């Protein structure tokens, strides 16, 4: 598990977020922003590692998945499709937030068709990310 990096702090106990982002700088920024909401964060660098990591954990281990869409090895949409089909109690219901620079309506539509729960376009603000996460965990679906 050489590309799995855990960033943990005692900011709260909202659970663990799986961050899937191939750019290390973007991952560090997102990690700080997610931790501010009280989550622990585990980071993997591509969709294939996300599928592997999600599949090897117990149901309910992750409270949230933050998924970049454009990544090498396996993109975020394929990873989301596979996660949604895993034989795990939480595979169909864990919130998955897509983060992408592709802001066309067809990109958003494709994300939702592939099982994404919420969609954020890059560049995004910390406020946007926090609002989407808070709305998702409170009501189910959010988009900005």
What are these regions (language model features)?
Residues 1-144:
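C-terminal compact regulatory domains
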């Amino acid at each position: 598990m050489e590309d799995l990096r855990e960033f943990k702090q005692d900011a709260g106990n909202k659970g663990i977020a799986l961050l899937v982002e191939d750019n290390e700088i973007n991952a560090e920024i997102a990690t700080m922003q997610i931790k501010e909401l009280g989550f622990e964060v585990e980071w993997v660098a591509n969709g294939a590692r996300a599928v592997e990591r999600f599949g090897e954990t117990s149901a309910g281990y992750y409270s949230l998945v933050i998924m970049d869409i454009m990544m090498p090895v396996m993109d975020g949409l394929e990873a989301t499709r596979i996660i949604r089909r895993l034989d795990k109690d939480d595979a169909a219901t864990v919130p998955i937030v897509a983060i992408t620079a592709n802001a066309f309506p067809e990109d958003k539509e494709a994300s939702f068709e592939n099982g994404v729960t919420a969609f954020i376009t890059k560049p995004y603000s910390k406020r946007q990310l926090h609002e989407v996460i808070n709305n998702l965990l409170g009501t189910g679906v959010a988009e900005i």
